[in-house]
Amino acid sequence: MLILAGFLLLVSTMTNIEAGIKVPGTIIGTGTKALLGGDLTDPEDDGAPEEDTNYNAKFTSSDEPGFGGGEFAFNVFDNILGPGNDKWCCGLAGIAEGEGMHITAELEAPHLLTHFTLSSANDVPDRDPTTWEVQGSNDGEKFTTIFSYDGDNLFTDRLQVIRFDAEEDFDAQTTGYRFFRHITFKTANWPNGAFFQIGEIEYFGTPADDTAVDPRSKLATQWGILKNSQ
């Protein structure tokens, strides 16, 4: 009986990942080299975060908008995993109940999300999202949940890249969206201290209709600087 009780106690204190229970996502590696690259926000991987140009998306966030800035929000789209200005950390005033910390990428045309990656930052695992969603919208106001997670920390390492696929980790999409938003509702640290951080986000998909803009045409995040790619 004592052996059984000890085993049950051990199991009860293990995370789903440690216990080998199926969790969403596939770990594909660590560090910048593990990023897939060429996502919808920057198909050519030539975005210039210092100037906020050469992106195919306009970015907005609930807090700390901008690249650089001392761990500002847009750093999750800089195509680099690392400390400091290569991550978004740590929020200014806690995560408001039901509101969340969110960052949105606005594309020029609707896309069907086929897969995405989410990466941990360089330190403090208790800042990793544990309750979070990826959402889509076509007006930037009303968002529909595409993927949701509420559970143990999915990351097992720092600067780790996890891939999430349609039909495996979330439903195959039949509606295309122009806006894709990542929103965090809870971390292990919430609501205490420096509670939140993300390393990188990548979104991938197919045009929702035949009128979608050629991804080789680069649009700055300020909308209007068009660069023709050969």
Segments (PLM) and residue ranges:
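Bacterial N-terminal signal peptides
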Residues: 2-12
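Bacterial Sec-dependent signal peptides at the C-terminal "C-region" and cleavage site
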Residues: 12-20
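Extracellular carbohydrate-recognition regions
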Residues: 19-62, 218, 223
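Short acidic, low-complexity intrinsically disordered linear motifs used
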Residues: 213-230
